[in-house]
């Protein structure tokens, strides 16, 4: 009598147990897991059962669907964001997750299209829907004024996007920067003059002429000339322009931890300096910087005899 082989089918796993195991794996790997990881951990579960469990977790808003270089990733969803995306389809959740991962630097729609692999028309529709729900917002970037980046609605855009204190509605505030430049230099000049008037030895005078970036920042804040809140980093940017102009020099000293104005045990000090070489006469005269220099000649519409800039300079 021939031997009869009977194929033993594994018992059907409880769908709830499969879902719980997938969630446990996601907690073990916070950055996300692939379908291969789930398959390796649960080899007895058929592909159809895995797909049903994953789709159910996605529909309940317990998992995020991400796309990486290696394929799709499943990541445990933040409980705070789960309620926000309730009722959204998987494509909308994917776009939201991509924007969330971009942080406060935002992401262009072109990059969203690349990461999601969705048609541009579908992405535009999803973006409008998310904007109407006030889940995301579009922000113009100073790097490319005609392009918008998308970020979560409650985020404050990064300085690289807005340009920081030096930009207003994507326009560079040159006059504001110039005023800050003058006031910072004025403060350091005053500090240097006070040191010279002390009549102490040269080394003490030199050390007394230095001011920390925190002192300069405090002085500017007390003047009240800025409508926006300036950080020490903003003031150091202004001080750097004075260094490039040859008006200020900087030195770095060691400082005790916790000292006001110190960073990582170091402190930046600045002082006003006199130029080593005086500027040439041509640079000081209006002709050296005149925007219509090439059109200026005697007998012409623009000439030295009727130059308003030369008249003002001579009267000064």
Swiss-Prot record:
GO terms for biological process: defense response to virus; innate immune response; positive regulation of innate immune response; positive regulation of interferon-beta production; regulation of transcription by RNA polymerase III; transcription by RNA polymerase III. There is a cross-link at residues 5, 7 (Glycyl lysine isopeptide (Lys-Gly) (interchain with G-Cter in SUMO2)). It comes from Homo sapiens. This is DNA-directed RNA polymerase III subunit RPC6. Belongs to the eukaryotic RPC34/RPC39 RNA polymerase subunit family. It is linked to Immunodeficiency 101, varicella zoster virus-specific: An autosomal dominant immunologic disorder characterized by reactivation of varicella zoster virus (VZV) infection in adulthood after primary childhood infection with VZV. The viral reactivation manifests as central nervous system vasculitis with stroke-like episodes and lacunar infarcts on brain imaging. Features include headache, hemiparesis, impaired balance, and other neurologic signs. Keywords: Acetylation, Antiviral defense, DNA-binding, DNA-directed RNA polymerase, Immunity, Innate immunity, Isopeptide bond, Nucleus, Transcription, Ubl conjugation. The [4FE-4S] cluster-binding domain adopts a globular structure that serves as an interaction hub that connects the POLR3C/RPC3-POLR3F/RPC6-POLR3G/RPC7 heterotrimer to the Pol III core. DNA-dependent RNA polymerase catalyzes the transcription of DNA into RNA using the four ribonucleoside triphosphates as substrates. Specific peripheric component of RNA polymerase III (Pol III) which synthesizes small non-coding RNAs including 5S rRNA, snRNAs, tRNAs and miRNAs from at least 500 distinct genomic loci. Part of POLR3C/RPC3-POLR3F/RPC6-POLR3G/RPC7 heterotrimer that coordinates the dynamics of Pol III stalk and clamp modules during the transition from apo to elongation state. The modification N-acetylalanine is found at residue 2. [4Fe-4S] cluster binds at residues 287, 290, 296, 307. It is found in: Nucleus. PANTHER family: RNA POLYMERASE III DNA DIRECTED , 39KD SUBUNIT-RELATED. Component of the RNA polymerase III complex consisting of 17 subunits: a ten-subunit horseshoe-shaped catalytic core composed of POLR3A/RPC1, POLR3B/RPC2, POLR1C/RPAC1, POLR1D/RPAC2, POLR3K/RPC10, POLR2E/RPABC1, POLR2F/RPABC2, POLR2H/RPABC3, POLR2K/RPABC4 and POLR2L/RPABC5; a mobile stalk composed of two subunits POLR3H/RPC8 and CRCP/RPC9, protruding from the core and functioning primarily in transcription initiation; and additional subunits homologous to general transcription factors of the RNA polymerase II machinery, POLR3C/RPC3-POLR3F/RPC6-POLR3G/RPC7 heterotrimer required for transcription initiation and POLR3D/RPC4-POLR3E/RPC5 heterodimer involved in both transcription initiation and termination.
């Amino acid at each position: 009598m021939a031997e009869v082989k009977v194929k033993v089918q594994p018992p059907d796993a409880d769908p709830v147990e499969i879902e719980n195991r997938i969630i446990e794996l996601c907690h073990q790997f916070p950055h996300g897991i692939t379908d291969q990881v789930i398959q390796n951990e649960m080899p007895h579960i058929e592909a159809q059962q895995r797909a049903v469990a994953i789709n159910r977790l996605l529909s309940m808003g317990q998992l995020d669907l991400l796309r990486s270089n290696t394929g799709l990733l499943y990541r445990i969803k933040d409980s705070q964001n789960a309620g926000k995306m309730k009722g959204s389809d998987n494509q909308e959740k994917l776009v939201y997750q991509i924007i969330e991962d971009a942080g406060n630097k935002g992401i262009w729609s072109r990059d969203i299209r690349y990461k999601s692999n969705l048609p541009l028309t579908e992405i535009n529709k999803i973006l409008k829907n998310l904007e109407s729900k006030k889940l995301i917002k579009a922000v113009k970037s100073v790097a490319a004024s005609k392009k918008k980046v998308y970020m979560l609605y409650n985020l404050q855009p990064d300085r690289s996007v807005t340009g920081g204190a030096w930009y207003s509605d994507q326009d560079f505030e040159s006059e504001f920067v110039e005023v800050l430049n003058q006031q910072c230099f004025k403060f350091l000049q005053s500090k240097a003059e006070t040191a010279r008037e002390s009549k102490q030895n040269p080394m003490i005078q030199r050390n007394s002429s230095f001011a920390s970036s925190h002192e300069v920042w405090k002085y500017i804040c007390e003047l009240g000339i800025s409508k926006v809140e300036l950080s020490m980093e903003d003031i150091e940017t202004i001080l750097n322009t004075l260094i490039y102009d040859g008006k200020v020099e900087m030195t770095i000293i060691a400082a005790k931890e916790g000292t006001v104005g110190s960073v990582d045990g170091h402190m930046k000090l600045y002082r006003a300096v006199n130029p080593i070489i005086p500027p040439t006469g041509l640079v000081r005269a209006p002709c050296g910087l005149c925007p219509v220099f090439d059109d200026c000649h005697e007998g012409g519409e623009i000439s030295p005899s009727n130059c308003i800039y030369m008249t003002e300079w001579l009267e000064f």
